[in-house]
Amino acid sequence: MSYEEIAVQFASESIDEQTVAGWVTDFAYQGFDAKRVIALVKDRGGEDWKQDVKKMIVLSLTRGNKPNKMILKMSDKGKAMVNELVLKYKLKSGNPSRDDLTLSRITAAFAGWTCQAADYVQEYLPVTGRAMDAISSSYPRAMMHPSFAGLIDQELPADVFSEITQAHCLFMIQFSKTINPSLRGLSKDEIVSSFERPMQAAISSTFLTSANRRAMLKTLGIINDNLKPSSSTVSAAKVFRSL
């Protein structure tokens, strides 16, 4: 039997729906899926999910993404709140599967609120607002979290897209060196390569439409109604290029 005949014959093989469905689950993408994160949050959170999400975002912004470690240095009231959230949402600290929730996934799924909240807690972030201002005057606070990448609209004019991305990278370099000291002696390109893949994945995500992203960027003051970047964004991008 020729290979062609084998291929033709194989086309008549039966398709068992239940078996195929099982394979789909087994092979499902294990990375970040914002829709799945939101579905899990709503399912596990009940009526209070919105308030809980705000708590978890502030927690992630100010204390990181590992609940089991952060509670070691926290008030009794804070510990109780964190432990309640961990139990309620089944929060994981590392190596999550598709149906696991982490603080970082929640901040990314709700990036619009995360980036607004960054302004309010700027002095409690790993890299503070004052620290960024020392590098680039009036640095955009909304860019001061990795989740901002999920709001960048790649359908903006090329020069605007580039300015916004480079301005965000300026923060990401400082953030990466702060949370990973081993990067501090590396070149700009080497540090960028450490966060470039997840950043590009967030930018390329189809979760938010171009229109939604632009609306959020306007709300955050990153671009105006004419799609022009703010002066602080342009300045930050210029500093990034000069590194």
Curated annotation (Swiss-Prot):
Keywords, alphabetical: Capsid protein, Helical capsid protein, Host cytoplasm, Host Golgi apparatus, Host nucleus, Ribonucleoprotein, RNA-binding, Viral nucleoprotein, Virion
GO molecular function, one term: RNA binding
UniProt-annotated location(s): Virion; Host cytoplasm; Host nucleus; Host endoplasmic reticulum-Golgi intermediate compartment
Main location, first listed in the record: virion
Residue numbers marked as site, RNA-binding: 29, 32, 65-66, 98, 105
Disulfide bonds: none
Pfam families found in the cross-reference section: Tenui_N
InterPro entries hit by this protein: Capsid_Phlebovir/Tenuivir (IPR009522), Nucleocapsid_Phlebovirus (IPR015971)
Chain residues that bind RNA: 29, 32, 66, 104-105, 184, 194, 197, 204
GO cellular component, one term: helical viral capsid
Quaternary data: Homodimer. Homohexamer; ring-shaped, necessary to form the nucleocapsid. Homopentamers; opened pentamers in solution. Binds to viral genomic RNA. Interacts with glycoprotein Gn; this interaction allows packaging of nucleocapsids into virions.
Biological function: Encapsidates the genomic RNA, protecting it from nucleases. Displays high affinity for single-stranded nucleic acid. The encapsidated genomic RNA is termed the nucleocapsid (NC) or ribonucleoprotein. The ribonucleoprotein has a non-helical structure. Serves as template for viral transcription and replication. After replication, the nucleocapsid is recruited to the host Golgi apparatus by glycoprotein Gn for packaging into virus particles.
UniProt comment concerning the protein's domains: The N-terminus is involved in homooligomerization.
Family: Belongs to the phlebovirus nucleocapsid protein family.
Name the UniProt record assigns to this protein: Nucleoprotein
